[in-house]
């Protein structure tokens, strides 16, 4: 008999008021087969990875069986999608429970592509293999980069075909998150006009993510401030690695501060603040350079839901919310500048740093330089290999950089070490991702996906094996389009 997988399930979300979710029975799939499995994550969750890879374990990962203590439900939420408010919910995902780890932490276990729910809005509730492999690959790459993110435990094919303009193999992704509470969850509660529901949800969020706030003078204001702080940190980290989320709707902003929803995301090759990849972002609302402002806007929508809880007087509540939101920009800029200094081997701050960095970025834009490789080449001491080489302004900037480093107490070797730990040698290059996914979906060969996952686990290794994955595409990124996969 296969050893138990060691699920240690609860579902605290199911104890919230009924409007926040819909209880469902799983939609079993015909012939589940394990394609990808994240053994280190399973171990961290206190699970028996070997048992999970056996047929009984795969049945859970496919949604055919719910472990004891679990309770399948689809979460309700709302959201501003490209600025337009609408009621939403999990249209193709089920929260089957919360795994309590050996050290007492709690993580959502969600099955994505698990079938229809009351929130499917006419969709089939299923997912195609390609987008599920893509989320596994990129979410785990983000984790390796040190960026807060939901994780991927497994991808299972269903043995069933789904229709997305053509027939495609169906799949289920097991997503792991600190929680799936979203700004949109609060908008859903507020949109129903039930202040008590908003309070219940806020109390739950505090208990789940910020228990230290329960005793603060105004716990709901503290909650708002903490979410702002986490998001300012998260967005700065996106910008530092050239990550373009692609669909920054309010339902895709988490209360935990994790990156969520990897549908149309991609990493920028050539540096350009106007970079957009998503097929549906025709106006560039969620372009790379707009992400901080959009995050600020989303957080303002979160603040609006909390106003009745901040103070008895509405005017006072609005003032408190506005004051908190105004703090986002300063926190974001501070985080981003601190991060960009590390990318340049700078240990201390100086007054002219922002102008100094912006000059480099302007030159990168003008010369169509690759974002990741520019910092990689500076780290390797090879500025002559960058796209700006030979430009007089770049020579001036290099001289300023050398002078800037010479004014700090740390040695050049220490500066280079700092750069190596903050400038990835490899990112999920769009052409490499597409190459791997095409092989997996069209040829049923998952070897390239597994190779890419292995390389991306060590983004700061600077190894010879990574050279192929650091190469820029032969054709520039203009015209590269991503799709949400729904």
Swiss-Prot record:
Its cofactor is Mg(2+); Mn(2+). The active site is at residue 251. Keywords: ATP-binding, Magnesium, Manganese, Metal-binding, Nucleotide-binding, Nucleotidyltransferase, Transferase. GO terms for molecular function: AMPylase activity; ATP binding; magnesium ion binding. Disulfide bonds: none annotated. It catalyses: L-seryl-[protein] + ATP = 3-O-(5'-adenylyl)-L-seryl-[protein] + diphosphate; L-threonyl-[protein] + ATP = 3-O-(5'-adenylyl)-L-threonyl-[protein] + diphosphate; L-tyrosyl-[protein] + ATP = O-(5'-adenylyl)-L-tyrosyl-[protein] + diphosphate; L-histidyl-[protein] + UTP = N(tele)-(5'-uridylyl)-L-histidyl-[protein] + diphosphate. ATP binds at residues 89, 91-92, 112, 124-125, 175, 182, 261. Mg(2+) binds at residues 252, 261. Its EC number is 2.7.7.-, 2.7.7.108. Pfam families: SelO (PF02696). The keyword Hydrolase does not apply. Nucleotidyltransferase involved in the post-translational modification of proteins. It can catalyze the addition of adenosine monophosphate (AMP) or uridine monophosphate (UMP) to a protein, resulting in modifications known as AMPylation and UMPylation. PANTHER family: PROTEIN ADENYLYLTRANSFERASE SELO, MITOCHONDRIAL (PTHR12153:SF15), SELENOPROTEIN O (PTHR12153). Belongs to the SELO family. HAMAP family: YdiU_SelO. This is Protein nucleotidyltransferase YdiU. It comes from Shouchella clausii (strain KSM-K16). The gene is ydiU.
């Amino acid at each position: 008999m296969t050893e138990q997988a060691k699920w240690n399930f609860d579902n605290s979300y199911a104890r919230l008021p009924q409007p926040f979710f819909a209880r469902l029975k799983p939609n079993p799939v015909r012939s589940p087969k394990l394609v990808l499995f994240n053994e280190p994550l399973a171990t961290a969750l206190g699970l028996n990875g070997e048992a999970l890879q056996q047929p009984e374990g795969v049945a859970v990962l496919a949604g055919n069986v719910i472990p004891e203590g679990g309770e399948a439900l689809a979460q309700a939420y709302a959201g501003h999608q490209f600025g337009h408010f609408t009621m939403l919910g999990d249209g193709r995902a089920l929260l089957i429970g919360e795994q309590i780890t050996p050290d007492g932490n709690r993580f959502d276990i969600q099955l994505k592509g698990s079938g229809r729910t009351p929130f499917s809005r006419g969709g089939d509730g299923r997912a195609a293999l390609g987008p599920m492999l893509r989320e596994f690959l990129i979410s785990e790459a983000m984790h390796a980069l040190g960026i807060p993110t939901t994780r991927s435990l497994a991808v299972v094919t269903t043995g069933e075909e789904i229709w997305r303009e053509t027939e495609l193999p169906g799949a289920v992704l097991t997503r792991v998150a600190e929680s799936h509470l979203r700004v949109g969850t609060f908008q859903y509660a507020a949109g129903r006009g039930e202040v008590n529901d908003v309070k219940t949800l806020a109390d739950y969020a505090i208990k789940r993510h910020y228990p230290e706030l329960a005793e603060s003078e105004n716990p709901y204001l503290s909650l708002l401030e903490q979410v702002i702080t986490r998001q300012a940190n998260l967005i700065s980290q996106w910008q530092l690695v050239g990550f373009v989320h692609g669909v920054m709707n309010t339902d895709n902003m988490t209360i935990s501060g994790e990156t969520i929803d990897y549908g149309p995301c991609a990493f920028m090759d050539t540096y350009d603040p106007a970079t957009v990849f998503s097929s549906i972002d025709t106006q560039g609302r969620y372009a790379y350079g707009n992400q901080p402002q959009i995050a600020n806007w989303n957080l303002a929508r979160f603040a609006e839901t909390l106003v009745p809880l901040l103070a008895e007087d509405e005017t006072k509540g609005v003032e408190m919310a506005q004051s908190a939101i105004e703090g986002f920009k300063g926190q974001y800029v501070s985080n981003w500048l601190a991060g960009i200094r590390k990318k340049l081997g700078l240990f201390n701050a100086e007054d002219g740093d922002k102008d100094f960095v912006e000059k480099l970025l302007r030159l990168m834009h003008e010369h169509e330089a690759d974002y990741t490789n520019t910092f990689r080449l500076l780290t390797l001491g090879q500025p002559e290999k960058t796209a700006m080489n030979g430009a007089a302004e770049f020579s001036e900037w290099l001289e300023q950089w050398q002078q800037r480093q010479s004014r700090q107490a740390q040695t050049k070797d220490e500066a280079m070490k700092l750069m190596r730990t903050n400038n990835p040698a490899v990112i999920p290059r769009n052409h490499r991702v597409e190459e791997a996914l095409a092989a997996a979906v069209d040829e049923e060969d998952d070897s390239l996906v597994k190779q890419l996952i292995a390389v991306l686990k060590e983004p700061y290794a600077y190894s010879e094996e990574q050279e192929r994955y650091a190469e820029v595409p032969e054709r520039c990124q203009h015209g590269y389009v991503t799709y949400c996969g729904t």
